[in-house]
């Protein structure tokens, strides 16, 4: 059984990193309003207001 410990640690690290990635992606898309996603013109105006 001690031979499985590094493999288990690697699997745990991979699962934690995947959970963090999914949480980040979900938060990024949930913070955006749905109207800006459905209408690209408002999205472009918002991006221009941010960068210019």
UniProtKB/Swiss-Prot annotation:
It is a single-pass membrane protein. Keywords: ATP synthesis, CF(0), Hydrogen ion transport, Ion transport, Membrane, Mitochondrion, Transmembrane, Transmembrane helix, Transport. Its main location: mitochondrion. One of its GO terms (biological process) is proton transmembrane transport. The chain crosses the membrane at residues 6-26. It is found in: Mitochondrion membrane. One of its GO terms (cellular component) is mitochondrial membrane. It comes from the Eukaryota. Belongs to the ATPase protein 8 family. Mitochondrial membrane ATP synthase (F(1)F(0) ATP synthase or Complex V) produces ATP from ADP in the presence of a proton gradient across the membrane which is generated by electron transport complexes of the respiratory chain. F-type ATPases consist of two structural domains, F(1) - containing the extramembraneous catalytic core and F(0) - containing the membrane proton channel, linked together by a central stalk and a peripheral stalk. During catalysis, ATP synthesis in the catalytic domain of F(1) is coupled via a rotary mechanism of the central stalk subunits to proton translocation. F-type ATPases have 2 components, CF(1) - the catalytic core - and CF(0) - the membrane proton channel. This is ATP synthase protein 8. It comes from Albinaria turrita (Door snail). The lineage of its organism: Eukaryota, Metazoa, Spiralia, Lophotrochozoa, Mollusca. The gene is MT-ATP8.
